[in-house]
Amino acid sequence: TATLYPINARRWFNAEVDACWFTLTIDPALPQGNYTIDVHENLFEGAGKIARRWGVVGTTLVSDLDAYQLVRSADGPSPYTWRSGLKHDAARVFEFTSFPENLESEYIYPLLKGTDVFRGRHQHPSRWVLVPQHKFGEDTTHLQYTAPKVWRYLIGHAAALDNRKSMIYRNRPRFSVFGHGDYTFAPLKVSCSGMHKESRFQLVTQAKTPRGTRPVVLDDTCYFLPFENSTHAALVTAILRSPECQAFIQSLVFWDAKRPITKKLLSHIDLFALPCDRPTIRATAAAIAADAGVRFDANEATELF
């Protein structure tokens, strides 16, 4: 058996760290396979009260075993593939606070960061990003002919770009970015921030730019599902926002992690297996679509969910 008692490290050690008192009882007479930890509220006040139980179910680490059992039926492979946002490690080069009129617009997209998604600023992007590749690993030398202004701009910042520290840029075409593909440019995305202490899902649509309507690109602090169909996108957003889905996420997530929401966690959610009230979900989806200004087909939604 195991127990964990959180300790207020600031109070007792004047340290800005997480701390705990962890006990483990090893007894060969106890039945095997009990991989659970009783997590108490505090080492001193309320020490006798168990706040929740951590444990391993199959191969999954669960942060609240009791809550997990109520929605365990939804723990299965996601019917959709979750994607990460764009990574470039050079914000001063690739990102802009106003539309860069001096660069070819084909490579300029509205940009949302995780904080924008979390704060509900997803309908009005205020940043722009230069995406020099439309597919991962795509050659970039053609830009000197197809987008000479973009090429000259990148050459002007070559020192910063060529010296990015991450290994992912090594042995790649010059000025490469990472975490992009056809899904990056999907017209609709159901997104959330991976960095915040609450899971908030937003329906991201295309945005108007000085050069016409463009897909919105999400940065690498976000996770998202790409969609072409607005009814499907609104319905999935409604399911992810449902109390049942939020309870499932709460049962798995460890909010004190640097990135509490992960692709691995999201990929555990079998959206269509959640015990939701389906008429309520469809009504919520219709409202989400109306707020986003996109089409919603009630009959199509009923067929899907």
Please state what every model-predicted region is.
Residues 1-94, 219-220:
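Signature of N6-adenine DNA methyltransferases within the class I
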Residues 47-58, 65, 267-305:
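Non-catalytic DNA-recognition/assembly elements of restriction-modification systems
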Residues 201-238:
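A short beta-sheet element
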Residues 64-215:
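Polyanion-binding catalytic cores of nucleic-acid enzymes and NTP/SAM-utilizing transferases
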Residues 223-268:
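Basic, amphipathic alpha-helical recognition segments used for DNA target recognition
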Residues 17-20, 108, 126, 188, ...:
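Residues that flank catalytic or metal-binding motifs in active/ligand-binding sites
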